[in-house]
C-alpha cells in the first residue's frame, strides 16, 4: 500500500511539472538580493528548458520588466540583468517575500509581501516605470530630456534628426519639433540651420557640440558612445551597456554587423566581467581605422532590424575637435562655425 502511495506521489509530481500550465515558487529576500535573485533549484531543474534567457516580470500594478536569467558554474539559475530595476521600483527590503507565478512561456506574475506584516505591500499595486530615470532640462530648448546613463554610454529619449552623411551644417536647438528620424531627415535644410550647441560639459569646443547633436539624433532604440582613448587607441574596445544588450537580446557571444552608408564591418560581441557586461573587440579596431575615429568623436548606434540575425547596427558619426585627419577620410559629420 505504501509503495502504491509513493508511486502515486511520484506520478503526481511528474504530472505537475510536465503538464500544469502555471507553476509557482516563493523566494525570501536575503542579504545580497538587490542585484541578483536565485531561482529555487528544484524549479530551475524542472523548468530549465522552458526558461528563455530573457523573461518578463509582471508587477501587481501591471508594469512589466525584462530581466535576464543567468546560470553560474554550479548550475544555479538567477534573475540578474534588469532585476535591480524591479527591486528599486518596488522598494523591496530584506525579508520581504515574493511569490512568482510562471505561465510556462516567458512571463512571471509577481506578488510582493511585506516581511514584517506578512501581508501584500499595497504600494506594489501603484508602481509606475517613470519616476526613477535621471532627468535633465535643456535650458535653451524649453523641453525636458530624459536620459539613462550607463558608464560612458548615453541614451536619450528626445529626438532630433540624423543629418545626412558627409554634410557640414549649422544646427539650432529648439527650432525643430521632436519628431521621428526619417521625417525630419527629409525636412532638414542646410541653409536654415543655426548652430547654438551648449549642453553637458564633456569637453570644450566642438566635442561638446558633437555630443549635443548626437543626443538629439538618437532614437529610443539606440545608444551613443563618446569616444575615449580606450575606444580608439589603447584597448580599442567598445563597451555596450548590459541593459541595452538585454533589451535587444545581445546576451551571448555572437556576430554583429556595423554599417556606415553602404559599407559594412563584421565584428564579434563577447560577454565579460561579473556584471555581465559585453562589448566588441574583434573587428572594432578595423572599424576605427577605416572611419578615422578619434577621441572626442561621438557615435550613435541604431539597430537596423531587430529580427535580423546577426544583429545589424547603423552607425552615425559626429566629429569632435577639428584636427587634421589621416588616411584622407572625410568626416561623416562635421560642425562649422
From Swiss-Prot:
Record field: transmembrane: none
GO molecular function annotations of the record: DNA binding
One GO cellular component term noted in the UniProt record for this chain: nucleus
DNA-binding positions: 22-116, 223-321
InterPro entries xref list: B3_DNA-bd, DNA-bd_pseudobarrel_sf, REM16-like
SUPFAM superfamilies noted in UniProt: DNA-binding pseudobarrel domain
Keywords from the named record: DNA-binding, Nucleus, Repeat, Transcription, Transcription regulation
Subcellular location: Nucleus
UniProt cross-references to Gene3D superfamilies, sorted A to Z: DNA-binding pseudobarrel domain
Principal subcellular localization: nucleus
Coiled coil spans: none
Matches recorded under PANTHER family: B3 DOMAIN-CONTAINING PROTEIN OS11G0197600-RELATED (PTHR31391), B3 DOMAIN-CONTAINING PROTEIN REM16 (PTHR31391:SF157)
Designated name of the protein: B3 domain-containing protein REM16
Organism of this sequence: Arabidopsis thaliana (Mouse-ear cress)
Phylogenetic placement of the source organism: Eukaryota, Viridiplantae, Streptophyta, Embryophyta, Tracheophyta
Gene: REM16
Amino acid at each position: 500500500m505504501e509503495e502504491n502511495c509513493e508511486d502515486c506521489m511520484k506520478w503526481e509530481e511528474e504530472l505537475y511539472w510536465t503538464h500544469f500550465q502555471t507553476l509557482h515558487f516563493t523566494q525570501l529576500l536575503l542579504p545580497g538580493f538587490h542585484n541578483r535573485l536565485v531561482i529555487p533549484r528544484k524549479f530551475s531543474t524542472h523548468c530549465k528548458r522552458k526558461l528563455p534567457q530573457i523573461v518578463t516580470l509582471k508587477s501587481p500594478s501591471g508594469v512589466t520588466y525584462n530581466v535576464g536569467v543567468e546560470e553560474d558554474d554550479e548550475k544555479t539559475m538567477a534573475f540578474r540583468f534588469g532585476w535591480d530595476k524591479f527591486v528599486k521600483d518596488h522598494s523591496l527590503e530584506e525579508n520581504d517575500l515574493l511569490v512568482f507565478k510562471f505561465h510556462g512561456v516567458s512571463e512571471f506574475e509577481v506578488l510582493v509581501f511585506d516581511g514584517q506584516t506578512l501581508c501584500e505591500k499595497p504600494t506594489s499595486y501603484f508602481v509606475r516605470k517613470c519616476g526613477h530615470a535621471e532627468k535633465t532640462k535643456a535650458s535653451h530648448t524649453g523641453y525636458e530630456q530624459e536620459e539613462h546613463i550607463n558608464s560612458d554610454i548615453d541614451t536619450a529619449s528626445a529626438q532630433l534628426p540624423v543629418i545626412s552623411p558627409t554634410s557640414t551644417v549649422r544646427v539650432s536647438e529648439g527650432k525643430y519639433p521632436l519628431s521621428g528620424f526619417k521625417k525630419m531627415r527629409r525636412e532638414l535644410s542646410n541653409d536654415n540651420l543655426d548652430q547654438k550647441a551648449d549642453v553637458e560639459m564633456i569637453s570644450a569646443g566642438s566635442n561638446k557640440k558633437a555630443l549635443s547633436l548626437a543626443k538629439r539624433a538618437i532614437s529610443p532604440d539606440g545608444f551613443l558612445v563618446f569616444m575615449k582613448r580606450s575606444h580608439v587607441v589603447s584597448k580599442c574596445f567598445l563597451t555596450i551597456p548590459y541593459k541595452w544588450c538585454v533589451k535587444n537580446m545581445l546576451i551571448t557571444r555572437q556576430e554583429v554587423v556595423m554599417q556606415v552608408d553602404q559599407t559594412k564591418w563584421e565584428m564579434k560581441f563577447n560577454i565579460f566581467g561579473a556584471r555581465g557586461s559585453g562589448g566588441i573587440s574583434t573587428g572594432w579596431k578595423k572599424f576605427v581605422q577605416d572611419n578615422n575615429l578619434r577621441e572626442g568623436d561621438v557615435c550613435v548606434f541604431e539597430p537596423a532590424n531587430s529580427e535580423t540575425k546577426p544583429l545589424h547596427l547603423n552607425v552615425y558619426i559626429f566629429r569632435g575637435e577639428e584636427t587634421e585627419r589621416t588616411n584622407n577620410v572625410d568626416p561623416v559629420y562635421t560642425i562649422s562655425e
